[in-house]
Structures are given as structure tokens and as C-alpha cells.
Amino acid sequence: VRRWWPLAVAFLVTLPAATTGFVLDDWVQRGVVHGKFDHTTKLALFNFGAGDAEALAPYIQRGPYPWFTLPELKLRFLRPLSSALIVFDTEVFGARAWPQHVHSTLWYVALTAVALALYRRLVPGVAAFAAVLFALDDAHVMPAGWLANRNAVVAVTFVWAGLLAHLAWRERGWSAGALVSTVCFALGLAAGETGVAALAYVVAFEAIGRGAQPWRERARGLAPVALVVAAYVVAYKLLDAGARGSATYVDPVSEPFAFLAAAPARLFANLGTQAFGLPDLWLVFPGAQGLVVASGLVATPLGWLAWRRWAPMDAAQRRTLAWLALGALGAVLPTLATFPTARLLTAASLGLAALVASLLAAAWRDVGARRWLGVVWLGGAFVLQPLSQWVALPVAFDTLSTRAADAVRALAVKEGERVVVLSSTEFIPAVYAVPLLVELGEPLPRTWQVWSMAPLAVDVRRTAERQVELEVLGGRMIDSMFEENFRGAGFPLVAGDRVPLEQATVTVLAVDGGKPTKLRVDLALPVSEYSFVWWNGDVLERLTLPDAGQTLHLAKAQTMFERLVRGPRAPD
């Protein structure tokens, strides 16, 4: 019975997620399935920008994309299998979220079963322990608990099932293994880009896992991977998938210099996040990004010292752990295309769990202070802290989705009204309000135009009957990660740039380093035809524009994350 404990752990840790509902991208994807949004199709639910200015124009002119969105923005990810699973859930289970979370739980248990099978083959002495660490890994919390992120679990499940078949083919001569692994690799890539990261283990195994062998033999072993990846790259380009124009997602093929510039900090941030079990500070608290990078710089020599002290003496076992570690490092590299976060490390966790289990087992047998140093560090980072995340994330998601629903309901949107978000320091009501209104079955506005989503105070000055100037104080627009998702620094704006919206035109009046600090909006209709709102730190609140010549000051309000962590406070 003990041999199956890892599967029980995988099942139990995902249970809290079953109590949460739908959140963020779930709202958008469910809206597409129900035919409420026409920017993409049911089998392309991860298309958030097609790279086509004409196709994106209505979503900028009417909203909810902010006015500064790059017209050619491309955020188009090729995940047809994962899209199909979401369509299945939506059409079979409807508005009931819990069965869809149970569906995710089953995938997570299957993933843990595949990992356990690999560990029994590769690290039999610590297989069950490694699989428990794997099941607890906080890198899996969001992929297993957020429906829109399930694609990562599905992708690595198939790829690592293919790795099992690959090992049987290469080490035991199972001839069907080549075909089975090829099919599994293809299914994994059809589920999501995380499958590419998971393939790093196959490459690492062929590179150093089999010891000395002719290059021709290594090439033979890599043939299934090469075939699938080549077909995948062709499909990716033919379907015009990829990312361009966003600072959040950088395509290493189309934007190699931007990728290389961002890669070092992102690499060490990811290493530190995994080594010390850090929560997603990079995303939630941008001011802590330097600390996250520093944690990775500290973790690197600590990891090397732990290896020197506690690595197994057996040469074959050291070689196995070495190729698993190399595979884990290789799995991190594709994640550098986007911002550092624990959920990107799903593919890296296979090798890390085996490595940590082996080192912890050796540390436990050590003597003196070294033993407790290793046990406290590795045990705390890879056991205790992840357990807290499995409980905390569902609570946070449930709280955020409830508060977001309360915030948009409080606005009492009228069917067909023209809503203008003057300022929202919180990105959820700024850009997710319309999908959330669809999910809630509330009346929909005709337009939802976002003028500022900078985390700054704003002055709104009425300069004429139908003219408004908006100036951010103490900073710049498009300078936070959520804003840069819509326009990267490589696409600067200049004073005089004009952006047409529906019944309004935005003109950039002043910039700082290509990022606006002041803009003018000319309204085509009387002010009474628009509904002006702002995020006050609690709800979306309606406002009345000041008289001509007067200024309205909107303070910097708390975000939902800040309110959740620090408690409520008045706007600055």
C-alpha cells in the first residue's frame, strides 16, 4: 500500500481546489465556448491576440483591451488538445465548476503515477519519497488548481509517458517504444508549450544518461523527438502561433535579442523560486523582483555544495541524477520566454524531486550541523512551504473571484452603456470585467474603454466640454507588468500619437522614455453619453467629470492582492 501513497497525496492536495469556481482566463474561454466572443475559435482558446491589427481593432476601440495595446499584438498559443478538454468540460458540466476541478485532479493523479513509474525505474531507492515530493511541489499548485492552466499538467503527462516508452526502447530493446514515445510526444505538444520543456529529459538522457556512445547512436535515439519537434515548429508557424509585442511573453525566435536580455534575471528568479519555495512574489509584488533574483544567485552555490556533500557514491546513480538535473535545467530554459513564476516549473520538477529526495535521504544519514542544515532547508522548501501553497491558492482564487464579482455587480452596468475606466490600479476589473459580466449573466456595456491601468495616482482635468486630459503622477503608463502585457518597451509611443476609439480619440501629449505620462481624450458625444468609473480599492465606483477647467484627483488605490495580503487601507 505504501508504494501508492504518492497518488493519494496527489489526490488529497488538489481537493481544496474543487471548492473554487472559475477565474480570469476561465471567464474568457467559457465565453468563447458559449459564443459570446468571436476573437478566436473553440479549439484555439489560448489565442489572446492574433497579430492582426484589423482583427484586434474592435477589442481596442470598444475594449476591454486598453487604448495603448499594440495593434499587431500576438499572444497566440497552440494548445488544441487542452482547448478541446475545456470545451468538453464546459459543454458537459456547464456552470458547475467542481466536476471540472475533479477532471483536473484526475489528470494530476495520472501525472504523479507517470512520475512514480519513472522514479521506480531511475531512483528505486527513493522512488516513493521522490514521488511524494513531486506531488507536493508548489510548482504544480496552479496548473492543477486553475482550469485555464491545466494544459501544463496534460502536456507533461503525455511527454513523460513518452519518456517511459523511450527508456524501455533504448534500455530494454522494446521496439514499439519508438512509435509509442513519438505519439505521446505529439500529444504532449498538442496540449501546450510546456511539453517542449518536458522533452528536455529525453535530450539529457541521450546526451549523458547512456554514458559513452557513438554520436550516430545518440542521433538515432533523438530521432522521435526531432521528428515531433520539427512537425510542431512547422505547425506553429503555419498557424501563426507565438508571441510578439508583449513584454510579458517574448518569442525567442522572432525577438531573440529581447529574449536574451530578459533571460538571465528570469533564470535566477526561477531557480530561487524553486530552491526556497518562494511564492509568486515577482507577479504580486514587483518591488520584490530583485530579491527573487538574488535568491537564485544564492541557491546556485548552495545546490552545488549540497551535491558535493550528499550526492550518491555509486557512479551509475550519479549519472542518473546528473541527466535528470540536466533535464530539469533544460526544462527551465523555455520558461524564460515569460515572467518568472512557480507554475512554469512543472516540467523542471521531475528531475528536481528525484535530486532533492536523494540528497535529503543522504542528509538524514549525515551527522552534526550539516544534517540539520540540509533537512531544514530542503525539507522546508520542498515539503512544508508547498503544503501551505496548496491550501492558500484556492483560498486566494476564491477570494479574488468573489471580490471581482462583487466589484462589477456594484457597478450595476446597464445594457449598451459606454463605460470609461478612468483609472484602475487593479488589472482584474480593468480588463476582465466584460468576460466576468458574461460569466455572471449581467447586462453588457457597448464599450469598456480603459484609459489608465497604471498603479499610480491620476489627475483628470476637463479642458473643454468634450475634452479631457489625464496625467499619471509619480511615474509612467505601460510601466507595470500587467500593462506591458499589451505593449512591450520595444514599441514606444511618442507625443502626438493618436489612437481612435469608438466615439473617442486618445492623443499622447507627453512621454518619458516612450511611455506616456499625459494624454488627451476627445469625446465624440456629450459627456452624458459616457459612464465614467474608477477602481477605488474595493469596487468600481461611478464618477462625475468635473466642470470645464477643473481637475479631479484619483488616488492610487490598493490592488486586490495588496488588500488580501496587507488588509484594507484608504487610497494614497
At which residue positions do the language-model features occur?
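Polytopic membrane enzymes that build or remodel cell-surface glycoconjugates and lipids
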Residues: 1-429, 433-438, 443, 504
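C-terminal luminal/periplasmic domains and tails of membrane-associated envelope-modifying transferases
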Residues: 409-419, 424-572
